[in-house]
């Protein structure tokens, strides 16, 4: 039995025992491995960084999906950037009110390998007739498409390699252009305790671009370093501050089943700790 040592941070990291190596390949864009671990189930890593595990992926995918969709309240067209493992697609597809799901993934091999070796992530969602799967660069897609979306979810890797451009100012500007009135953009933004500069940079790039911008958090064990942040940008100011009962009713009406998300978690996730507020130049969470 060998180990998989993550290489995201210098001098600090995590190690997974490899109980069974399922697949390893260098794709056109990155080095991909999928293996089994007794504690976390099947695990996928790209370029030395753990991307997802069967054990806790539901936290990440539910929070990046249901927070913006239920805050919007009437999302019909959803764009997923990245998300090749299919977990985000699975959660978006739970919303029967969504009429069209466009998913843009740069690496088709990731999609193929995850269909084969991580089927529990997508649970058949790649066969959903509402899906338009595009194998292309996410930055190029949002910069050139004429389509408009109610919710955009950027499920990117860390800002290294193929995912680096998905944290750029040009990317955020292009996403804003692609949003319908009342639209929402959410992106994964790393763990602020270890990646505070990424949060600070994203704040600077979204400030002034959206009527309301902020971050929200969730604790995902796989992503070491504490709670993970997700960036939020909306074209309407009030969507982040909906009454709790409104969110509870929307959640009930949606009929979706979750393991982590609920309306109380939704509202509470936007309460950022003081060191994050200071980093993004905000006095409070309003």
Curated annotation (Swiss-Prot):
Q: Which domain of life is it from?
A: Bacteria
Q: In which pathway does it act?
A: Amine and polyamine biosynthesis; spermidine biosynthesis; spermidine from putrescine: step 1/1
Keywords per UniProt: Cytoplasm, Polyamine biosynthesis, Spermidine biosynthesis, Transferase
Report residues binding S-methyl-5'-thioadenosine. 30, 105, 137-138, 162
InterPro entries named among the record's database cross-references:
PABS, PABS_CS, SAM-dependent_MTases_sf, Spermi_synthase, Spermidine_synt_N, Spermidine_synt_N_sf
Segments passing through the bilayer: none
Record's subcellular location: Cytoplasm
- UniProt keyword Cytoplasm, yes or no: yes
GO MF terms, alphabetically ordered:
spermidine synthase activity
Query: Record-annotated residues binding spermidine?
Result: 61, 85, 155-158
What Gene Ontology cellular-component terms does the record carry?
cytosol
User: EC annotation?
Assistant: 2.5.1.16
What GO biological process term is on the record, naming one? spermidine biosynthetic process
The catalytic activity, as recorded, is: S-adenosyl 3-(methylsulfanyl)propylamine + putrescine = S-methyl-5'-thioadenosine + spermidine + H(+)
Entries under HAMAP family matching the protein = Spermidine_synth
**Function as written in the Swiss-Prot or TrEMBL entry:** Catalyzes the irreversible transfer of a propylamine group from the amino donor S-adenosylmethioninamine (decarboxy-AdoMet) to putrescine (1,4-diaminobutane) to yield spermidine.
Q: Which family does it belong to?
A: Belongs to the spermidine/spermine synthase family.
Q: Describe, as the record does, how this protein assembles with itself and its partners.
A: Homodimer or homotetramer.
Per its record, how is this protein called by name? Polyamine aminopropyltransferase 1
What gene does the UniProt entry assign to this protein?
A: speE1
